Every structure is written in structure tokens, then in C-alpha cells.
């Protein structure tokens, strides 16, 4: 999977009510192992005591796409997605809202079914017709280089038509849903982990027919 965020940091920050600060993002695609804008309402680093008497602001900061795997999995690649919400590796981060974050995007790519012309698999870029810049649900882990992983859920009809079983969790286009993910209890936040309506998605296949 890849995704794109075709908007500069300042514009994304305004759209999500987040302080962009010195984020250098100017727009483009994001691949695993690259830094990308992340919107969080928690601390930048969890080590140390929580600041007393101060409300933490929603802000956008660069973080690495990919979380170091558990120590019990030697020589494994970084983990890019969260699929098992009950996994001991993830449950603490999911229940603690400080570790939940939003990943802004304008489209994401999955490999689709082979082209009828040449039999080669095509890139399928999925966008949301009802929100030009959307938020994908994610969590981050506090490590030497803090990284994030996207939450995955069952694929909707548009993704299943291309042979996919899962898709990233896309939040509805309203501030209330984003607030629940960033601040709410896990019982409320977990209810957002569901497929986005395929009727609200557009797909572009490359190369085109």
C-alpha cells in the first residue's frame, strides 16, 4: 500500500484544526519507511511525566510509517498496519488516546486485479468523493524514532472488487469523529473501525484502459 497527500502542511493543518508548526511537508506520495504528517492530540514523546494543568493542543508532526516489530519476532520488517485489535502488541496503544493519531491523505493505492489487456496487476488509487483530504485512523508507538501504523478493517465492495480483503480505516468527514478518535474512550473509538462506504469512494486504475 501507498498513499498520497497532495496538500501542503499548512493547508492540512487548517483543514483539521491542527497546528502545523515547522512541518516541511509540501505534498506528494508516502511509502512505508518514509516520514509523513501525523495529527495527534497527545504528547510528542511519552517518556516523562504528563504536563500538569495544561491542555495538549492538536498538532501535526512528522512521523515514520512503520513500527518496530515485537522483540519476539527477530529480523522482521516494521509493522505497517494494525489488524488484530486485541493483540497485546497494540491494545495498550489503542486504549490510551494519547497514542491514537490521524493520518491525512488524498488517496491510497492498492494493487488490483490483472488488466484484461496484458494480465498485469494495476495500481488502484482510491479517493473519497465526499472529502478531498480524509483522515485515516492510526496509532503510534514511542520508540527511538516514533513510528505509526494504520488501522485496517474489512474491505468494502470497491476494494473487494479488486481482490482486496482489507482496507485502511477512514474516518467520517466531521470533527466529532476525529475528536472521538483522538480523545474518546476506546469503546467509542473502536466503533469507528469499520469500512468506509464504497458509494462515497472513487477509484482510478493505472495504467488506464
Language model segments and positions:
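Short linear sequence motif anchored by a di-proline
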Residues: 1-209
Amino acid at each position: 500500500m501507498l498513499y498520497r497527500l497532495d496538500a501542503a502542511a499548512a493547508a492540512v493543518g487548517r483543514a483539521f484544526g491542527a497546528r502545523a508548526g515547522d512541518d516541511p511537508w509540501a505534498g506528494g506520495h508516502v511509502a512505508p519507511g518514509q516520514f509523513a504528517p501525523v495529527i495527534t492530540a497527545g504528547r510528542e514523546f511519552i517518556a516523562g511525566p504528563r504536563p500538569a494543568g495544561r491542555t495538549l493542543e492538536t498538532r501535526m508532526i512528522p512521523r515514520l510509517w512503520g513500527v518496530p516489530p515485537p522483540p519476539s519476532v527477530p529480523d522482521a520488517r516494521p509493522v505497517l498496519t494494525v489488524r488484530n485489535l486485541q493483540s497485546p502488541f497494540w491494545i495498550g496503544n489503542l486504549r490510551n488516546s494519547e497514542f491514537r493519531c490521524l493520518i491525512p491523505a488524498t488517496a491510497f493505492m492498492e494493487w488490483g486485479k490483472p488488466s484484461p489487456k496484458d494480465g498485469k496487476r494495476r495500481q488502484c488509487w482510491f479517493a473519497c468523493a465526499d472529502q478531498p483530504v480524509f483522515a485515516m485512523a492510526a496509532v503510534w508507538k514511542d520508540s527511538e524514532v516514533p513510528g505509526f501504523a494504520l488501522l485496517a478493517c474489512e474491505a468494502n465492495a470497491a476494494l473487494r472488487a479488486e481482490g482486496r480483503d482489507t482496507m485502511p480505516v477512514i474516518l467520517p468527514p466531521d470533527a466529532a469523529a476525529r475528536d472521538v478518535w483522538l480523545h474518546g474512550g476506546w469503546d467509542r473509538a473502536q466503533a469507528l473501525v469499520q469500512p468506509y462506504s464504497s458509494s462515497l469512494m472513487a477509484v482510478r486504475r493505472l495504467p488506464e484502459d
